[in-house]
């Protein structure tokens, strides 16, 4: 079922994924149960997000199964030309554009108007070069349920001293933060060499 959903994205949104970027886009580490996709940025489905780079995605097992604990549970990282410290407004505004564009691109029912996405975030912690955010994305599920859903979200924004840019890691799930789905999600992490140096050395 997951593969069917990925094919739908590929057809509907003209997602760019190429073997020549395979090494570059191996930005996240997760075990073999997680499916992977990569998307070129700017997004074809959300061109209003005006950055250049790549999105590296990991989908939990059962991402497309309504009855699975992994339903709509996934993570992605943006490796983009972003050199301004991100704020709650940045994430709220850009995730609205992202999900509105994605759901409208996937939607096949022209008789309905997709409701606008609502987002809310708070900055939770700042530790060295990592700033954490927590919040929600309320959006229309054009893939499976055809209903509004609320995704709980955490974001870790990493500052790379060598490249002088910020790299945000997003984790999403409709499950409560105490659910075991979040134990799985938190095991999806950035690779140590994502900043062309070791994450332990980021200051």
What kind of feature is each model-predicted range?
Residues 62-142:
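Conserved polar/disulfide-associated segments of primarily extracytoplasmic proteins
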Residues 20-58:
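N-terminal "mature-domain start" segment
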Residues 128-202:
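Short, well-structured beta-strand
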Residues 4-13:
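Sec-dependent N-terminal signal peptides
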Residues 27, 60-65, 143, 155-156:
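Catalytic micro-motifs at enzyme active sites that drive phosphoryl/nucleotidyl and oxygen chemistry
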Residues 14, 48-50, 158-160:
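Short beta-strand micro-motifs enriched in acidic
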């Amino acid at each position: 079922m997951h593969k069917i959903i990925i094919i739908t994205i590929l057809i509907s949104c003209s997602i760019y994924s190429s073997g020549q970027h395979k090494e570059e886009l191996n930005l996240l580490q997760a075990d073999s149960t997680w499916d992977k996709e990569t998307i070129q940025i700017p997004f074809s489905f959300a061109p209003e997000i005006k950055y250049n780079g790549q999105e590296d995605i990991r989908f939990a097992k059962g991402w497309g199964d309504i009855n699975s604990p992994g339903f709509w549970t996934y993570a992605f990282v943006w490796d983009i030309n972003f050199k301004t410290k991100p704020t709650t407004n940045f994430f709220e505004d850009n995730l609205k554009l992202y999900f509105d564009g994605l759901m409208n691109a996937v939607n096949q029912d022209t008789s309905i108007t997709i409701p606008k996405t609502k987002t809310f975030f708070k900055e939770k912690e700042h530790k060295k070069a990592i700033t954490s955010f927590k919040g929600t994305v309320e959006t229309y599920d054009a893939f499976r349920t055809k209903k509004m859903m609320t995704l709980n979200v955490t974001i870790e924004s990493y500052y790379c001293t060598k490249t002088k840019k910020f790299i945000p890691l997003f984790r999403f799930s409709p499950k409560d933060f105490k659910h075991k789905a979040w134990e799985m999600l938190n095991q999806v992490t950035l690779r140590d060499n994502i900043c062309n140096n070791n994450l332990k050395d980021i200051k």
